[in-house]
Amino acid sequence: MLKVCVIGGGPSGLMAAYTASLVGHQVELFEKNKQLGKKLQLTGHGRCNVTNSCSKDEFFKHIVHNEKFLYSPFSQFSNLDMIQFLKSNGLPTIEEDHGRMFPGSNSSQDVVLLFVELLRKNNVILHMDEACTDLMVEDDKVVGIKTDKGLYSFDVVIVATGGKSFVSTGSSGDGYKWANTLDIKVSDLYPGLVSLRTKENFDLAGLSLQNVGIQVKKDKKVLYKQLGDILFTHEGFSGPGILAMSSYVIHKEPDKIIFDLIPDKSIDEVDAFLLERMNRSSNKQLNHILEMMIPKRLVQYIMDRLNIDDSLKANETTKVQRRSISELLKCLDFEVSSFAGFDQAMITVGGIKTNQIQPQTMESKKIKGLKFVGEVLDLDAQTGANYIKFKYYL
């Protein structure tokens, strides 16, 4: 029997503590907050999007960085195993769009309470409101930890401190600091799954668009191209499509984002379609015809941007004006100012480099008995659901 310490009471820490206790180890979990699973309770707007029902192949498509590192952990405990784990412990899940899985109770609190019950049943000692301040290492082996309340000796220390996102939940990047001190390599860190700010100002906050083409460029080079849902904000753009994109390109500092509002048609097809509508309703105002294609608020923005008068009728519209509208519908571009910071980020992009860790055991290749799990590692995914999923089973 080993004395095992888990630092961090988030998803990966809770699962690590439970898994270690299952095989008879003496486990103690340290959490700097007064409650466990603080960040976990924010997922799915408080409903807790615990995992996803997608296939193995689909799962790995959504991993942005270092997906091969996850092959071994995934083979030991998959998303389907997670669903069965919850069900067997009295918390069945329900499936919603895009395979998102939620607890049947629709309460993130129930997920946290389940883990608390399991940990206490297995005699895991919980140190709440106690912050770990340093790791104790001797002769390249971890021997314990220092906290703001004392010193503790352990055979194994599992660091599950999370990243730097959602600072209000206690994530302050401690794991990275300790790794750097021990010469365990950490990649550059960036906020992930964040909104984008533009240089242009527009009065479209709250407007959402579904299944539009999203293209991001830097110096005219395409960095990212995908379909997704977007939301106009007071500062720029958010929504699932923007959040997913951000993790791919934030470190490349893009300068332009372009939206294709009608991705299933070419510019010529859009132009022909618009001409047909205008011929059919030649006495109608042009903006009313456009409102049959895109939201009214966006029509007003496009008309203003092209300096086209609101009162212009279809039969008064020139070929050049019509073509300009078609081109803007296919290429609505904005200059990128910046992305939101860690205070608004859902995840951290980057972390402890995976080549420093044994994927079968999550143990450091440099320090015996020291393991890193969850968001502290250089692993991130496109969506919150997939992200929570691999945080659990690492």
Listing of model-derived features with the role each one plays in the protein:
Residues M128-K141:
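A conserved short coil-to-beta-strand element within the FAD-binding core of flavoproteins
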Residues K34-L36, Q41-L42, V50, K56-D57, ...:
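An anion/pyrophosphate-binding glycine-rich loop and adjacent beta-alpha core
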Residues C5, S21-H45:
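Glycine-rich FAD pyrophosphate-binding loop
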Residues C5-I7, F30, C132, Y152-S168, ...:
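Short hydrophobic core segments
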Residues M1-S12:
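Beta1/beta-strand and adjacent pyrophosphate-binding region of the FAD-binding site
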Residues S165-W178, L182, L379-L394:
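A conserved FAD-binding loop/helix module that cradles the flavin
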Residues R47-E95:
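Glycine-rich active-site loop/strand segments that organize a redox cofactor
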Residues M128-D129, Q300-D380:
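A glycine-rich dinucleotide-binding beta-alpha-beta segment and adjacent secondary-structure elements
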